[in-house]
C-alpha cells in the first residue's frame, strides 16, 4: 500500500509558537511509531514567526531541536515550498491566531486537500470566545455570566470606558476574569478583584485583542473532556485539573508539575455523563470536526455543570490533557494520531 504523505504544519505567527513546536514534535514521534511508519510519510513545514514557510532541512532541524529557528529572509515569505504540491493530507499543529481560528484552514480548504481538525466555521467559532459563547447560549448550554467589550470602548473615550466598567460592576461583579477573545493558552488573562484592577485588566487585554470578554468568577472544580470524531463524535473520560495559582495560566499549563491532573476525575457517575453529553453537544454546536477539548466548571455546592470553552485544536505536549484523556480512554497516542488522519480523509471525501 502506498504511504499517505502527511504535511505537518507548525510554528506560526502567534505567541504560542513554541508550544506549537513541542506539539508537532510529539505528533511527529507518534507518526514514526509502529504501525504508522508503514502508512504515513511525514513532511514537516515550519512557519517562522514572520510568516515565512520552510520545508526540508530547516523544518526537520526545528523538530529535532524543539525550538524556533532564526527568522527567514523576508523575500522568501511569498515562496510556498514546492513539497506542498505532493501532500495527501495536512496536519496543522498551530495554536492561537492564524492557526486555530479558521485562517490556515481556509488556505488548506483552497488547496482542496484533506486536513485534520475543524473547518473554517468551526475553527473560527471555537477561537473567538464571544462568538463561542453566543453559539453555546443558542444551543442551551449553561455558562457563567459574561459581558463583551471592544478595544474602542476601552481606549477611545473615558466616558464610554467608565460606562463599560459600571456595567461590569453591576452585571458581573467581583471576582471576574478579563480575557482577550481570540488568544489561547490563557495568554493575556487577568483575575480581577476590584474596580481598579478591572480598569487595568481591560487596558491590558485591549493590547492583545480588539475583542474582550469579561466572565464572572465561580467557585468550582475545573474539568475537561476530549471529543473525537466527525458526524457521530464520542467523548473521552473526564479529567480534573487542580493548581495553586489563581487560574490555569500559561506557565501552569506548560510547566510539568505546576498542575495536578486526575484522570478519570472523581465525579458522580451522573455528573460525568452530563459533562460528556455537553461536550458532544458543544462540539456539534460550533460545527467542529476531528477533535476538540471542552472545558467545564463543576459547581459542587449546587451540582451545576457550566461550560467554559471549546478548544478545536488542543495541544499535544507532554502536559496536554487531550492525548492523556484518550490514553486513559483506551486510545494510545500513535493510534489517536492515526485516527485523526483517517477522520480528516473521511470528512473531506467527496459526497456520493
From Swiss-Prot:
Compartments, as annotated in UniProt: Cytoplasm
Main localization category: cytoplasm
Domain of life where this protein originates: Bacteria
Cellular component aspect of the GO annotation: cytosol
Keywords linked to the UniProt accession: ATP-binding, Cell shape, Cell wall biogenesis/degradation, Cytoplasm, Ligase, Magnesium, Manganese, Metal-binding, Nucleotide-binding, Peptidoglycan synthesis
Protein's pathway: Cell wall biogenesis; peptidoglycan biosynthesis
Assigned EC number: 6.3.2.4
UniProt similarity note: Belongs to the D-alanine--D-alanine ligase family.
Protein name: D-alanine--D-alanine ligase
Source lineage: Bacteria, Bacillati, Cyanobacteriota, Cyanophyceae, Acaryochloridales
